[in-house]
Amino acid sequence: MNRYYSNNQEITVSLIPRTERAAFLITPTSYGKSVLGAPLLYFPAQVESNSRGLILAGTHGDETASIAGLSCALRSLPAECLKHDVILSMNPDANQLGTRANANQVDLNRAFPTQNWTEHGTVYRWSSHTPVRDVKVKTGDKEQLEPEVDALISLIELRRPKFVVSFHEPLAFVDDPAHSDLAKWLGKQFNLPIVDDVDYETPGSFGTWCNERQLPCITVELPPISADLTIEKHLDAFIALLQHDPDL
């Protein structure tokens, strides 16, 4: 049994028994292919709703806790309760290779065709304890998008979500300059503070691309956490998100 609050109403849902959670009850749909030819998959919402959103993880292949958390939530929730489209990973090649960037060494979260996109590459932090961000990766080509980026844009244009929640690690906050009700709800569910930005430049980011199109995008940064502990601590929050009906 899962209980949570949505728009100040208590919602109770009978979950799939744990013994039956190995398989997905919803068949994913392909929306493209990665650089190495892996299918890009999304799980379509099963509830007709004017507030259907997109829940996204796996932009960086080495950020796996939210992928596991979302997957377990999908397999725990009865299919007919899924209110939002879900992408467990938009970067499957990097998941397989254990890298942040895709198979072309492009950071997908710096490769969206935004006004502030730069061709000069970017850097990231090797680990949470590394004092500087100095590992070099590419930012792609604004005129010839990475297949993972191009496919996601096409899917959003097709499905027209009302909002996006994008999961990352390991900064431990909810990033939403608007401090929206949805961001506050997410902060409460995942026990994370809300911030205005990540405190460094992010040219070509997915969030910027969404903002330029007036598509609300909230980034949830989980703390440095294992997949196992994510499931233990945050499964209820992921399950609640998949059913949440935000007041947009």
Curated annotation (Swiss-Prot):
Which cofactors does this protein require?
Answer: Zn(2+)
Principal subcellular localization: cytoplasm
Q: Which residues are responsible for catalysis?
A: 221 (proton donor/acceptor)
Gene3D superfamilies under this entry?
Zn peptidases
InterPro entries from the xrefs? AstE_AspA_cat, MpaA, Peptidase_M14
In this chain the Peptidase M14 domain maps to 3-245
Q: Which Pfam families match?
A: AstE_AspA_cat
GO terms for biological process, alphabetical: cell wall macromolecule catabolic process; cell wall organization; peptidoglycan catabolic process; proteolysis
Which cysteine pairs are joined by S-S bonds? none
UniProt-recorded Gene Ontology molecular function terms = amidase activity; hydrolase activity, acting on ester bonds; murein tripeptide carboxypeptidase activity; zinc ion binding
- Residues bound to Zn(2+) are 60, 63, 168
Which EC number applies? 3.4.17.-
Give the similarity note.
Belongs to the peptidase M14 family.
Q: What does this protein do?
A: Involved in muropeptide degradation. Catalyzes the hydrolysis of the gamma-D-glutamyl-diaminopimelic acid (gamma-D-Glu-Dap) amide bond in the murein tripeptide L-alanyl-gamma-D-glutamyl-meso-diaminopimelic acid, leading to the formation of L-Ala-gamma-D-Glu and Dap. Has weak activity with L-Ala-gamma-D-Glu-L-Lys, MurNAc-tripeptide and gamma-D-Glu-meso-Dap. Cannot hydrolyze murein tetrapeptide.
| Quaternary state and interactors | Homodimer.
What is the name of this protein? Murein peptide amidase A
Native species of this protein? Vibrio campbellii (strain ATCC BAA-1116)
